[in-house]
Curated annotation (Swiss-Prot):
Species for this entry: Cricetulus longicaudatus
Cytoplasmic side: 48-51, 140-144, 278-359
GO molecular function: ubiquitin-protein transferase activity; zinc ion binding
One Pfam family cited in the UniProt record for this chain: Pex2_Pex12
Membrane topology field: Multi-pass membrane protein
Record's protein name: Peroxisome assembly protein 12
Binding site for Zn(2+): C304, C307, C325, C328
Keywords from the UniProt entry: Membrane, Metal-binding, Peroxisome, Protein transport, Transmembrane, Transmembrane helix, Transport, Ubl conjugation pathway, Zinc, Zinc-finger
Subunit structure, as described in the record: Component of the PEX2-PEX10-PEX12 retrotranslocation channel, composed of PEX2, PEX10 and PEX12. Interacts with PEX19 via its cytoplasmic domain.
Gene3D superfamilies to which the protein is assigned, alphabetical: Zinc/RING finger domain, C3HC4 (zinc finger) (3.30.40.10)
Family from the record: Belongs to the pex2/pex10/pex12 family.
Gene field: PEX12
Length: 359
């Protein structure tokens, strides 16, 4: 039985084809980096909204731009994405087995480079936006934010009904491809690699030497520049390369930090964490920073600060502790991403509905 399993796991279509463990590990690397950076930006934005609130509001776009620079840098210099290069892999143009292989240091051909960039950067961005849209529409539908006569109601309800099945089909497509890869029936573990016209292979010793040689040459050589246009082009190229190199260095260090966090929060360390965090709840502050003269704060505790009417569907903001009508605060937070009273960065997920005994 073990012999049969070993045969299956080593049944590669190509000799330099990486194992399923390597390709899954490199796939999960960038997947782990995004939420980690998002959490860091969230903490900074909550601690100083004036300086870091912009980065929280536009996190997806900023991350996509930096990811684009990073992936372009690696694809054009190592024929691999950042995570693939981190695990010693490279992208090989499909159908080039009969021809001399292009060295990894030469980068991918332009057509395959842009296809790879689109699937590595643009597609994840669109997927994140689609998931946020589905989550937002689901919450609006659950609490009937839209009026019954809304023309969009039928459309977004159809979208909400179809989205889980489309997502399931998408994930099933990837799972099927991975199973075929494990059984040696496919040379791509991901359908996106096939669409990009490339496959993954391991870096050879010659590839590693050539990449290191090219990096050392780039730092030493300075080509004579003739025109102002060439100077600007070279300066932009160096700036982009410097940003990408800084990102790659920071991410390389961050990867080890993420692995440490993964170990820290593993099941083996749960008892240690509980013993450290099982501290008594501190008493409430004697004096709260409460400005009774604020025009937004009503005199009666049952009045919503936004609509100035008796609250309906009491909802508290976890970021500030103030209570509003659900409809009022939902629309405000969705538009401004902040608490109406304190201005603290706030998302729809911070809304907590209250159910009093009187209701």
């Amino acid at each position: 039985m073990a012999e049969h399993g070993a045969h299956i796991t080593t049944a590669s279509v190509v000799d330099d084809q990486p194992s399923i463990f390597e390709v899954v590990a490199q796939d999960s690397l960038m997947t782990a980096v995004r939420p980690a950076l998002q959490h860091v930006v969230k903490v900074l934005a909550e601690s100083n909204p004036a300086h870091y609130g912009f980065f929280w509001r536009w996190f997806d776009e900023i991350f996509t731009l930096l990811d684009f620079l990073l992936q372009q840098h690696y694809l054009s210099r190592t024929s691999a994405s950042f995570s693939e290069h981190f695990y010693g892999l490279k992208r090989i143009v499909a159908g080039s087995s009969q021809q001399p292989q292009r060295p990894a240091s030469a980068g991918l051909p332009k057509e395959h480079l842009w296809k790879s960039t689109m699937f590595l950067v643009l597609l994840p961005y669109l997927k994140v936006k689609l998931e946020k849209l589905a989550s937002s529409l689901r919450e609006e539908d659950e609490y009937s934010i839209h009026p019954p006569s809304s023309h969009w109601k039928r459309f977004y309800r159809a979208f909400l009904a179809a989205y889980p099945f489309v997502n399931m089909a998408w994930e099933g497509w990837f799972l099927t491809q991975q199973l075929r890869y494990i059984l040696g029936k496919a040379e791509h573990h991901s359908p996106l690699l096939k669409l990009a016209g490339v496959r993954l292979g391991r870096l050879t010793a010659q590839d590693i030497q050539a990449i290191e040689h090219r990096l050392s040459e780039a730092s030493v050589m300075q080509d004579p520049v003739r025109s102002v246009g060439e100077k600007i082009k070279l300066a932009l190229k160096k700036a982009v390369g410097g940003i990408a190199l800084s990102l790659s260095t920071g991410l390389s260090v961050g990867v080890f930090f993420l692995q440490f966090l993964d170990w820290w929060y593993s099941s083996e360390n749960q008892e240690t964490i509980k013993s450290l965090t099982a501290l008594p709840t501190p008493p409430p502050p004697v004096h709260l920073d409460y400005n009774s003269d604020s025009p937004l704060l009503p005199k009666m505790k049952t009045v919503c600060p936004l609509c100035r009417k008796t609250r309906v569907n009491d909802t508290v903001l976890a970021t500030s502790g103030y209570v509003f009508c659900y409809r009022c605060v939902f629309n405000y937070v969705r538009s401004h991403q902040a608490c109406p009273i304190t201005g603290y960065p706030t998302e729809v997920q911070h809304l907590i509905k209250l159910y009093s005994p009187e209701n």
